[in-house]
Amino acid sequence: MVMSDPIADLLTRIRNANVVRHEVVEVPSSNIKKAIANIMLTEGYIRNLEEYRDGSVDMLRITMKYGQNKERIITGLKRISKPGLRVYCRKDETPKVLNGLGVAVVSTSKGIVTDREARKLGVGGEVLCYIW
């Protein structure tokens, strides 16, 4: 099956697992998905990320992170730039999510980075998603 929006699929799988408090989510791997998951790992939204091969398909195993008493660390995930409507920002228009409490994932010429890194590098790009 061909997916029209693999990034939205990744975010939806993580959102659904978060709602029912699953420990592990498995998604088909790609470079963009890996970069977004790595940002989630470094920002502290997920516990672990590993890549493995299932037959002929590369997969990502994402271990979800919860607080004490299983409260959710991820309160929201939102896809911003979609295949039907791309959203771009200039270097001086990089969005802040919840006044800096959340993270905007931006695809730039320097790679896929957070909004803070994009401001530091002085680059703009396509705003992929918000995580808070």
From Swiss-Prot:
GO terms of biological process kind: translation
RNA-binding listed as a keyword: yes
CC annotations in GO: ribonucleoprotein complex; ribosome
PROSITE patterns recorded: RIBOSOMAL_S8 (PS00053)
Highest taxon of the lineage: Bacteria
Keyword vocabulary terms for this entry: Ribonucleoprotein, Ribosomal protein, RNA-binding, rRNA-binding
Thylakoid keyword on record: no
InterPro entries documented for this protein: Ribosomal_uS8 (IPR000630), Ribosomal_uS8_CS (IPR047863), Ribosomal_uS8_sf (IPR035987)
GO molecular function: rRNA binding; structural constituent of ribosome
Family: Belongs to the universal ribosomal protein uS8 family.
Subunit structure: Part of the 30S ribosomal subunit. Contacts proteins S5 and S12.
HAMAP family: Ribosomal_uS8_B
PANTHER family reported in the protein's UniProt record: 40S RIBOSOMAL PROTEIN S15A
Function recorded in the entry: One of the primary rRNA binding proteins, it binds directly to 16S rRNA central domain where it helps coordinate assembly of the platform of the 30S subunit.
UniProt name for this protein: Small ribosomal subunit protein uS8
